């Protein structure tokens, strides 16, 4: 999905525009502590680094066969990038913006997420139906955890305070709740076909699961289980982001009547 603009979540105002004539950005990782955005430039098989003040591309690093999920480990000062088609996770040193390691996963890399509770990077591995944990400082795999009931895990979100992970399976359209204390699956729930991106509102304890099939399923956390709030359909709504302060939910839509659109919704309307 070509991205041409960004928005201030606080003011819902258009702030800047980046020409993407030669780049297609599919995933952004925005890290204010670095003053940079790391974006997957899939057409070039690289990760682009954009300065948040000047909005200029200051570096490109790779090769990464198909860069997808992006996460930042602050202690190690490293960015980890899912290489979905390369069956690996790529590691970028943010002090030099250079590729310093490639971690083989023996399967397609789904989402990559940093867990501040454990200090580890989590990667969903498609063909292995498991979560892999990585020590950011050594860039070594430190754990393999099967996710029974989930086929081809891809999207992930965490409730860090409750020590829960939510993992969606692309092949069987299920969502798992995983207890991070023991890495056991507590329950699974049906979601829309081809689930992609997950977003968790820490204030409302509410989870959105967006799917390639246009379906969005909304859950409310209830202890260590989930209660379905509702579901609805939005064209191209396979990407979602939430602001836990305002509770607004953002859906960047690729093509609505011939042009990209950012749809912003209040949680009370997502039923």
Question: What is the predicted role of each segment?
Answer:
Residues 1-271:
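Predominantly soluble domains enriched in secretory-pathway, periplasmic, or organellar proteins
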């Amino acid at each position: 999905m070509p991205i041409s603009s960004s928005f201030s979540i606080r003011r819902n105002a258009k702030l800047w525009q980046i020409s993407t004539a030669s780049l297609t950005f599919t995933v952004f990782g925005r890290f204010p502590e670095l003053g940079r955005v790391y974006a997957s430039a899939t057409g070039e098989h690289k990760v682009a680094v954009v300065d948040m003040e000047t909005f200029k591309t200051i570096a490109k690093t790779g090769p990464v066969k198909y860069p997808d999920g992006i996460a930042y480990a602050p202690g190690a000062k490293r960015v980890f990038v899912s290489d979905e088609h390369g069956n690996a996770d790529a590691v970028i040193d943010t002090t030099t913006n250079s590729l310093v390691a490639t971690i083989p996963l023996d399967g397609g890399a789904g989402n990559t997420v940093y867990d501040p509770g454990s200090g580890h990077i989590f990667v969903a591995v498609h063909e292995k139906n498991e979560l892999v944990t990585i020590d950011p400082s050594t860039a070594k795999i430190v754990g393999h955890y099967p996710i029974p009931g989930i086929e081809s895990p891809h999207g992930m979100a965490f409730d860090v305070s409750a020590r829960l992970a939510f993992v969606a399976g692309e092949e069987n359209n299920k969502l798992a709740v995983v207890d991070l204390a023991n890495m056991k699956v507590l329950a699974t729930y049906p979601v829309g076909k081809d689930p992609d991106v997950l977003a968790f509102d820490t204030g409302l304890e509410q989870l959105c699961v967006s799917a390639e099939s246009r379906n969005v399923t909304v859950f409310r956390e209830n202890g260590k289980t989930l209660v379905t709030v509702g579901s609805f359909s939005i064209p191209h709504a396979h990407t979602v982001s939430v602001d836990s302060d305002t509770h607004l939910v953002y859906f960047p839509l690729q093509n609505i009547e011939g042009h990209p659109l950012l749809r912003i919704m209040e949680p009370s309307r997502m039923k």
